[in-house]
Amino acid sequence: MSIPKLSRRQFLALSAATAGVAALGSRFVPLPQTITPAGAAEPSLSEGQWIPTCCHMCGGTSGILCNVVNGRVAKIKPNTDNPIGLANVSSDYWQHKSEGAAMCPKGNAGIFTLYDPDRVKKPLKRTNPEKGKGVDPKWKEISWDEALDEIAAKLKALRDNGEAHTLLWFTEDSSFTDIQADFCDLYGTPNYSMHSNLCDVSRKAIFKSVMGHDRPLGDTVNSKYILFFGWNPLSATKWSHLPRTITRGIENGARFIVVDPYCSFTASKAHEWIPIKPSTDGAMALAMANVIIESKLYDQKFVDDWAVGFDQFSAYVKDKTPEWAEKITGVPADTIRRIAREFATTKPAIVDAWSGPGQHSNAVQGGRAIAVLAALTGNVDKPGTIMIPNKGGGAHPPIRVKKTDKPRLDGLSKFPMGHSSGVYTEIISRILDGKGPYQPKMAVVMFQNLVLSIPGTNNVIEALKKLDYVVVDDIYLSETAEMADIVLPGSTYLERYEVIGQWVTWPVVSLRQPVVPPIFGQLPEYDVVIQLGKRLGLKDADGAPFFESLKYEDYISKMIQGGSAKITLEELKALPGAVWMDPKGTQYEKHLAEVKPPEGATVDPKTGSVKDKDGKLVGVKVGDKVHKGFATPTGKLEFFSESLASKKDINGNPIDGLPAYTPRDWYPDDKFPLFLINWKESHHTHSRTFNNPYLMEIQNWNRLAINDVTAGKLGIQDGDEIWVESPYGKAKAIARVTQGIHPEVVGWQHGFGHWGFGKVAKGKGTADGQFNVTKSDPISGMALHKEVCVKVYKA
């Protein structure tokens, strides 16, 4: 096995093919047929129009400007009127806006995705009934009306037979999917699922249980100590401003520590990288808490005023010493002790954790142990700490609908901190074992590649084969599309609308809008839904046709008017950069806002929680004042959660109200002695950007990182062809021998290993999902992308 490189000849051929795509139809003007020689002056871009929109090469929604000349996109650059790409705190944004914003490699490469010659251009119908990995579907091109009529007929037959609930719907977690959720409600299926379940629902559960908000954000610019567990924001950039804000924090004097089994790009830029065994982050955090409490370095006044359960937590960590944690984590006790003292005595400080600790079976409890370190030191919602964002956005237009009383297939309600995005692994498992409340019959998959995204690739393929009918809407013939009966050509983010509530610390609403019309005349996903709704005659609870006269522009205009901005779609378009932001900016310590409790309110003498006569929390009494508090059940930060303690996980096990450490379910043994982890980088998103030659030039293969000492013991050298084997899968890979990974761990970048998708993506690297178990965290339902052990040997 050798790693192929994209030659300049191949690159030019792809670019020429892209030009041909852009030339399709009389409306379109071809891209240049040649590549500008290196060093030549860039063609003038003064002509045409600069249209503001938001990127969607990943979920970060960076603000961008697209130069459209004669009907084609000629250039993409950052939009400085949008804070994503520049800052997440308003003062930093307004002070440094003139410096310009940033954009990651994916954003720059978006033009190729728009004009990729491998895009699906017309609806396709399967003519080969056999399904399986690598099986030729023998596609037949059909018209849009034929495709929509057939899909609607299948949906109508299900509904008329009383089986509407057997429809599965998978999609992205963006506002353009709200109308898809409406469709599912009106049609009668509870099985609407979104991408979040495959990404960060455990982190959402972690912080929601401790702080009451599921996505706090770090004010790194103003911090003096930044401690990250299992997060790579300088490369796996969720938001493109993160490298800048973290770097500016370091320039302002912050000490930067990264705890991670792998020396990621972020770890390589930190003052200190602390290699740790996967899934043991919670044990290190508990030992840090032990040191902070025993040394009386915690913020006693903040804890007394704004936390519950401290006494129970303090008693629990009494024996969780650094020496105890060293045996579990592999991190030296002296290092844990030193980091704990540095963190507690350097103010302000940030502690944060993402998918590293979050994609294991002990994710929520381990993550809670990390989150309570912020509460312990008073580093919450203050400048330079972990912030509770005052996020803005659109409001889902109200709809009157009588929802089905059928249960979800995935058992979401049995996950005590499950997320509305569903539980993908449970759907797959229940299709295969038949232990769900019913067997699903049909699936609609929009903008998702389930086969390479859900742990346990072979299980996903077998589950899709068991469905009677599968519809995929995508821009590529992905591995999931390969399993479909109908494939609809999808839209890119440059061809559709969406309202974006930006993930910054103050309310900001921006617009994703078409900068060119759909280049193949295809319907954007929301118009597909509208057309299906019309064909099915879907009505609301009052009997009024919901989709009959609906225009999506009107739908999102109502979203904008009902949300933070309170303006119309046209008014948002007219604002600089098509961005609205609250002029009040970032607000700190929002929990301190004083409130007037209603008449008849009562105060819990134990917690200070103030509730109205109906038992609803309305504030928190601290001293002689009633404050807004946090959005937890008690209104305070929770070291101990009575809510969790009263519940059981999906397996029927009682949940500890404390962030108790328990080992994850799968651990190395003699047969499979190495942890296997994965990660992401800035030049790719999940499994969906691998047909872009600009990005594949940066990295076109995911070699398996293995510690040099471990490799030496196994007789493996850098570049060797190797076998990777787990209890669930076996495949060849190429070794990357390095000092930058824990000796008991191997790992690689997620998303490679396509056998479909497109000419550039096909056959590059190894698909990591095939090695994993199709399971989820029992509390949050998070897919377990890192819960597997392997053996590695020379091929």
Regions found by a protein language model. Give the residues of each.
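Active-site phosphate/pyrophosphate-binding segments
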Residues: 288, 307-424
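N-terminal leader/propeptide and maturation segments of large enzyme subunits in energy/redox metabolism
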Residues: 122, 126-146, 297-333, 515-619, ...
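N-terminal export/assembly segments and adjacent metallocofactor-ligating motifs
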Residues: 2-295, 319, 332, 531, ...
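Flexible glycine/proline-enriched surface loops and loop-helix/loop-strand junctions
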Residues: 135, 229-231, 269-270, 319-324, ...
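Flexible, glycine/charged-enriched surface loops at secondary-structure junctions
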Residues: 162-166, 298-303, 350, 381-388, ...
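Glycine/threonine-rich phosphate-binding loop and adjacent beta-strand/alpha-helix elements that clamp
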Residues: 217, 494-518, 528-529, 533-538, ...
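Long, contiguous, secondary-structure-rich segments that constitute the structural scaffold
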Residues: 524-578, 687-705, 709-795
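Extended redox/cofactor-interaction regions of prokaryotic respiratory oxidoreductases
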Residues: 2, 180-246, 252-259, 266, ...
